[in-house]
């Protein structure tokens, strides 16, 4: 299945706290990173391993090491930055690519305004991070950009997803795996996820929310 709703008890508990409207910026930011780390654990379970040897305290020890493609983490600005450290806490050697995608609040259409991608993308697994998968426009635009640059293995990590956004991504890119902490009810008339988390970018950075979900 290309869509994975991770219903681990720790994720369910932390996400429940994040839904509180009165949660502090500090707590929301920390929980975003914690849930991102748990999603990363799930999204990398099938990474290939190769045997290796190390010198232990009692002599040579046979161990496993991660093999295969290197990883690039791709936060979609700006809200994706809030998940970045959570992913890097588990994969500290990963390179970071940055994609800027903005959504027109009237048309709900996404457009890219920034592209800072690492090299050798054809040899990397890309983990795109964005807290909210709403209409799917931003995610599709980011995937389009990565594929144009040569990346062929892409996974998306989101805190909350709407069915409409999932459908949009899989229609455009059926080869992409989606890992999300929750599939919510759907979008309201303004294109916001219900019940959602509110504006994740505003809640992570402490700026004023223009709309509430």
From Swiss-Prot:
Pathway: Pyrimidine metabolism; UMP biosynthesis via salvage pathway; UMP from uracil: step 1/1. 5-phospho-alpha-D-ribose 1-diphosphate binds at residues 78, 103, 130-138, 199. The keyword Zinc-finger does not apply. Uracil binds at residues 193, 198-200. Its EC number is 2.4.2.9. GO terms for molecular function: GTP binding; magnesium ion binding; uracil phosphoribosyltransferase activity. Belongs to the UPRTase family. This is Uracil phosphoribosyltransferase. It comes from Bordetella parapertussis (strain 12822 / ATCC BAA-587 / NCTC 13253). The gene is upp.
